[in-house]
Swiss-Prot record:
The keyword DNA repair does not apply. Belongs to the MecA family. This is Adapter protein MecA 2. Keywords: Competence, Sporulation. GO terms for biological process: establishment of competence for transformation; negative regulation of establishment of competence for transformation; negative regulation of sporulation resulting in formation of a cellular spore; sporulation resulting in formation of a cellular spore. The lineage of its organism: Bacteria, Bacillati, Bacillota, Bacilli, Bacillales. Homodimer. The gene is mecA2. It comes from the Bacteria. The N-terminal domain has binding sites for ComK and probably for unfolded/aggregated proteins; the C-terminal domain interacts with ClpC. It comes from Bacillus cereus (strain ATCC 14579 / DSM 31 / CCUG 7414 / JCM 2152 / NBRC 15305 / NCIMB 9373 / NCTC 2599 / NRRL B-3711). Enables the recognition and targeting of unfolded and aggregated proteins to the ClpC protease or to other proteins involved in proteolysis. Acts negatively in the development of competence by binding ComK and recruiting it to the ClpCP protease. When overexpressed, inhibits sporulation. Also involved in Spx degradation by ClpC. One of its GO terms (molecular function) is protein-macromolecule adaptor activity.
Length: 202
């Protein structure tokens, strides 16, 4: 579970599928307002209070986004409405706004350009050449669409990506808006040709 404060009344929580399975939950369970799901959100709010000082001292709205093969992003917004602190975690104050984003595209973030180069070299040798490369907030982001993954099984593709980076908790729309596009087509092939192939020829 990774937490990030977006502003004074909004936080973002990234849950991996392992986080869910440890609690006996599946992705599909989040679309239901079951007791185990309510307990998950209570746990998340307690963790947010501990790590970020984010107190659920009023009604909260919860938006859930499913990232294909990566996990879940949960956006929690604290509404500006007074309430009794004894009711802090009462279920009626949790407004579920489930947004199902079942995009088959994959977005990963990387700490350094070297991570992207090493990943691209490995993927290129496996026949993967597509993708778009972005940079934002001193990190690099590789966006790969579904039709560009056909050379590998999705599970294998994700496993390789995970060796070099992490699933992005930012959406592609946020990165497009605030970041900079470095390569708009065949990023993996371009990186391989420029950084790996060129180096080998020198």
């Amino acid at each position: 579970m990774r937490l990030e404060r977006l502003n004074y009344n909004k936080i973002k929580i990234f849950l991996t599928f392992d986080d869910l399975s440890e609690r006996g939950l599946t992705k599909e369970d989040l679309w239901r307002n079951a007791p185990k799901v309510q307990q998950l959100f209570r746990d998340m709010m307690q963790e947010a209070n501990k790590e970020l000082g984010f107190e659920a001292d009023g009604p909260i709205a919860v938006e859930v986004f499913s990232l294909q093969a990566q996990g879940m992003v949960v956006i929690v917004t604290k509404e500006n409405q007074e309430m009794d602190t004894d009711d802090e975690f009462r279920d009626e104050f949790i407004e579920m706004q489930v947004t199902l984003d079942e995009s088959e595209h994959i977005l990963y973030e990387f700490a350094t350009l070297d991570d992207v180069i090493n990943l691209s070299n490995r993927l290129y040798n496996l026949g993967v050449t597509g993708g778009k490369l972005y940079t934002w907030d001193e990190r690099f982001y590789l966006w790969v669409e579904e039709e560009e993954q056909i050379q590998l099984l999705k599970a294998d593709f994700i496993a390789i990506l995970a060796e070099y980076g992490n699933p992005s908790t930012a959406t592609i729309y946020r990165i497009m808006e605030y970041g900079k596009e470095l390569m708009d087509v065949n990023a993996i092939e371009q990186i391989h040709n420029y950084f790996v192939k060129k180096q080998n020829l020198s």
